[in-house]
Amino acid sequence: MLRAGSVVTCIACKGLLPSRMGVKFRVPLQKLHPLSRAIHHRYSANNNPQRPPHCSAARHYTSLSRLPMRPPKSRSGGHGYQQHRTFWVARLAARLLKLRYILLGSAVGGGYTAKKTYDEWKEMLPDMSEYTWIVPDFVWELSENIDLDKLASALPELEEIAKLLPDMEKIGENFTFLKSLLSSETTGESALRAPDVPPASAAMADSGDKQFKKSSDKEKVDQLQEELLRTQLKYQRMLERLEKENKELRKVVLQKDDKGIHQRKVKKSLIDMYSEVLDILSDYDSNYNTQDHLPRVVVVGDQSAGKTSVLEMIAQARIFPRGSGEMMTRSPVKVTLSEGPHHVAMFKDSSREFDLGKEEDLAALRHEIELRMRKSVKEGQTVSPETISLSVKGPGIQRMVLVDLPGVISTVTTGMAADTKETIFSISKAYMQNPNAIILCIQDGSVDAERSIVTDLVSQMDPQGKRTIFVLTKVDLAEKNLASPSRIQQIVEGKLFPMKALGYFAVVTGKGSPNESIDSIKDYEEDFFQNSRLLKDGMLKAHQVTTKNLSLAVSDCFWKMVRESVEQQADAFKASRFNLETEWKNNYPRLRELDRNELYEKAKNEILDEVISLSQVTPKHWESILQKKLWERVSTHVIENIYLPAAQTMNSGTFNTTVDIKLKQWTDKQLPHKALEVAWETLQEEFARFMAEYKGKDQDDIFDKLKEAVKDESIKRHKWNERAMDSLRVIQHNALEDRSITDKPQWDAAIQFMEETLQSRLKDTESVIADMVGPDWKQRWMSWKNRTPEQHTRNETKNELERLLKLHEDHTAYLANDEVTTVRKNLEARGVEVDPVLIKDTWHQLFRRHFLQKALLHCNLCRRGFYYYQRHFVDSELECNDVVLFWRIQRMLGITANTLRQQLTNTEVRRLEKNVKEVLEDFGEDNEKKVQLITGRRVQLAEDLKKVREIQEKLEAFIEALHKEK
């Protein structure tokens, strides 16, 4: 007897396992396992084992569907199918639980591979530390101004990010539900039919799962996109806020610079105080064409003579850009040397310190100097007279101020400006002609003395040699190349060159390699002079060699010159200050001494007050001037292209149709543009009117150029709102579509508007006719005027055409050809030769006058026609369609003026005020613009007084500190 539980179990297994897990094949039944035969054959009452062999579908069972080889025991009970507990679910769970080991191993291996890949990529990236000099100075200080707490608060919360992650609880519930489906057991007939259903049900389940997965993925993508947009908007707002704060901080810094607000006072060294005075004097000299006589060390020499190398040895750092044979020093470089605990360099206008002990900082400093030099050179020039100020501090550095000048050249090569040689000579002379300047003359010892150019220049500027120090460079090459060592002795004794000097020095500034360090150059220099025959044979004295002795001698000479001349310079500036103050008191006794920046701030406030006055214009004034200007702009088009052509028709319906078509075309194409042009011109005129009215109230005329420039630039930048034209077109179209005049006052206003317009046109037409026919008999007798032959011909033509109009008062606007011929023949009969073109031209003006006179009579009749219009009576004499047309035009003008007034007061005036503020800010940051717009002797005198006072105060402070040091 077959067991029902086994049959049910097999059917359940076949339903759970897809068909692809086994390959169907046909085998004889007797070759199957006895249990398989029991499963694959239906139960029958007779237990006959003898059955004919037949083919049956069999499967290769996997480990998930393994069945016991021993036949299961039957339960106690009757016949039929019996439930049988199986352990296939437990086996399935055991197989699934093995996945955790696979996942854990994959995670560990994947993490290791990812880390290894990241390290490989990181090694392939270039070292960006060498390019830190590209980043501007303010970026390094940005971290001090950024509030990290605010940035952290602006980032998404952890809970919001967690919402975007997959819901693990839902995944667990789905897995439990799937497990329950797999573990459920079916009974009865439905269980037996299960093998026939699985393909369709499985397909439906798979499609449902895929659809659910697609929908969930789509929801996740939408959530991620929304979160990305929210984050983007949040950072955009942060960026806008930071830009606004940066702009405000920049404005505060500019105001501090302009108003002279100083930071906390820091005690400065003596040399720093002196260098600051020289910087102020340098600006004062370049702006006012004056020369100070304060001492400084001027380094001059031929190109590639070693000037820069000598200066670097004194500064103990390779701070200047180098080039093999080409010009590298393109502008004067003022170097303030002082002693300090750390070897650093800093520009005058920057707070960044360059650590001269680090090679990357040295490279950045050299690059910055080269950039500043190239920036100072104007287009089409090779060198610049602008000075670059640099301070160098370090242990063992002698205190002094040196100025490195461009090397003197003998020939202008390709790529240089034609006046390069003369410019270098003029710059060198400007520094050397200072009677207190110390000239450090650098001469290349490896070239012939006869090729020297700078020695002649120095001998011209200091013929007695009282402030010149001669330096012979590249002595090692000179000793090696020169056959006669006595020639070097003649140079350092001052016998070879036609110049005199306070002292003569011989130095070695390295082997010529740009990569040599200062220490290696010093060692090489000391070794050379210790082993040199020049020193051993007595040709050179010990105090005349090495850059160390040179720097000590130059420093002593510098400070000696400073002590002797600084008080004299202070007295000179004191006298200059007295002269300037006296001139101010005599010429401007009741005015405060305001420099250019202070005057600009005053003018800025006045201009902003004038702009604010625009908001005080009354709406009635805006609308009246807008309506008046708009009608002046469009009246010709309305009369000539709309009213006159439509009025020639004799039918009321044709008149209205023509008017509607022409009004629609006019509204779609021209009218909105004309209206915006009128509004823009009105805004400009009102702005100019307020500035002119404000000018009369004790305004300083020194601001006229500035105010005019601000007004022009603001108007140039102002653009009308683009959406205004579309809305205005709709409003105008709706206003012109309305034909219903509701009350008598509107009717009377339209008639008055029409009469004024027609009378104005009639007056213009009569003036044209009077010019055509010349003076009448009264003017000829009273004013002694005569008609020209053409005027006489036109007068005869006019008289003939007037007769025609009297006969045909309802004549059309154009003459027929036979009528032209008749008029011409009548005139010829009276001896007047006339051209047909002249006849038509005269007819046009006469008919125009005739038509306008008739229209005025009709307009007068329509004064009593409102009742007929309101009741829609049909009366040919009182068809006042032209009155309705003028009412539509008048109403459109009023509505347009009201709309434009709202746009002006609500939007455009504020936008114009914003433009004015931006223009004022831009002009305030442009010093050249301020110098160009605020000019005059009064401004110049105030600027001179401010500078001279500042120089005198700093000189007195320096002299006081100098006396204390003594």
From Swiss-Prot:
Residues 404-407 are annotated as: G3 motif. Residues 507-510 are annotated as: G5 motif. Residues 113-776, 788-966 are mitochondrial intermembrane. The record marks 193-194 as: Cleavage at site S1. Keywords: Apoptosis, Coiled coil, Disulfide bond, GTP-binding, Hydrolase, Lipid-binding, Magnesium, Membrane, Metal-binding, Mitochondrion, Mitochondrion inner membrane, Nucleotide-binding, Transit peptide, Transmembrane, Transmembrane helix. Residues 595-842, 880-934 are annotated as: Stalk region. Residues 301-308 are annotated as: G1 motif. Disruption phenotype: Morpholino knockdown of the protein results in disrupted mitochondrial morphology, leading to bioenergetic defects. Embryos show abnormal blood circulation and heart defects, as well as small eyes and small pectoral fin buds. Moreover, startle response is reduced and locomotor activity is impaired. This is Dynamin-like GTPase OPA1, mitochondrial. It comes from Danio rerio.
